[in-house]
Amino acid sequence: MIGLDGQRRPEDSPRMTYEPMPLNPPPYGSATLPDLACSLLASLRVPGEPDVLGLPRADRACLLVVDGLGWDLLRAHQATAPFLSELAATAGPISAGFPSTTVTSMSSLGTGLPPGGHGMLGYQVARPGEGKLLNALRWDPEVDPVAWQPAPTIFERAADAGVHTCYVAAAAFRGSGLTRAFARGVDYRGVHSLGELTAGAQEALRSGVADRTLVMAYHGHLDSTGHTSGVASDAWRYQLAHVDKLAEQLATGLPDRCVLHVTADHGMVDVGLDERIDVDAIPALRAGVALLGGEARARHVYAEPGAAADVLATWRELLDGRMCVLSRDEAIAHGWFGEVAPEFAARIGDVVAASYGQAAVVASRAEPQESALIGMHGSLTQDEQLVPLLTLTTV
């Protein structure tokens, strides 16, 4: 037996079959972000798109994506967000998908596919055969976004059906590798403030370029505030109040025959110092590991040749009760990623570890900035998976 200090202990019992506490896979095909994307197209009468969620039909649809606005967080702060909470009183949540992180969730929204179908499988994933990671937020000029994520986007499919599309988000994201991967074929409107985001979305809805319009608006400051200050902080609550006002102002300026939907890419939990397991301080967790991908609450662990079984056994032993640790084949079989296209399977770690509770596997030397975050996400817990689906219509 190996302790969390990395030292081997005498065996005190026979090795048992691994039976982790259950982490339920997202309900792909019934109530997840990719289902929302397809249903959104169906609501605009795009042929061939499954209307899983039964969204109201309209000529114009706006999807406001608030990064980090988990369902449980919203319900716990009703006084801070009265407008959104009023909508939530007659609505419910859907699930983000795994891992519950921006790269994966925005790609699910942008393609209508589960993570295993679009291949954007985490914050950092292996580039198979190259011995290096792709950080999908920062991207790498060596990687072609179209080759990495080749599926047609919802914006391309909408355009083929005569629907005008617009994506309103920070100007800094225009042309990024991630944007080109999940938002190809869209009219990108870069903004610098909440006011510009609101006005830009309303102007796009009223543009009259086509008889049907789809607008996606993305706001990321709630997530960044949660990362740096924590979701239990005053700063996070103040930022939530700004988000509530943003949604209210956007709603008051909707044109006729329009539907506004509000959702998020994931929730968030605060991780205390005593809940952090540092792989850079525990040699046993680094043994046999070629690359450490994913993020602190959803790890892709890529083993050196021939070491996958040993890495799996060690991670299970050291992280028992704190992380659910599966092999690649087990994670796929459990449905964590949805149906996985064969060409994307090697991007998944030889070992996949998802957090229970508030645990996190950090890497203080290799990932100093990420390891210092207070708010984190990525796993399959309810706090991270459930996101709101709020709807307001002028139809």
Can you name each region flagged by the protein language model?
Residues 9, 14-48, 76, 81-92, ...:
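His/Asp/Glu-rich, glycine-adjacent segments
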Residues 61-69, 77:
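A structured, charge-rich N-terminal accessory region that forms the first stable segment of a protein
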Residues 63-65, 214-218, 261, 352:
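Structural motif
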Residues 67-68, 266-268:
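Active-site metal-binding loops of divalent metal-dependent hydrolases
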Residues 88-106, 285-305:
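A short, conserved beta-to-alpha structural element at the edge of catalytic cores
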Residues 222-260:
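A long, amphipathic alpha-helix that forms part
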Residues 268-294:
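Acidic/histidine-rich catalytic neighborhood
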Residues 290-395:
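Active-site neighborhoods of enzymes that stabilize oxyanions during catalysis
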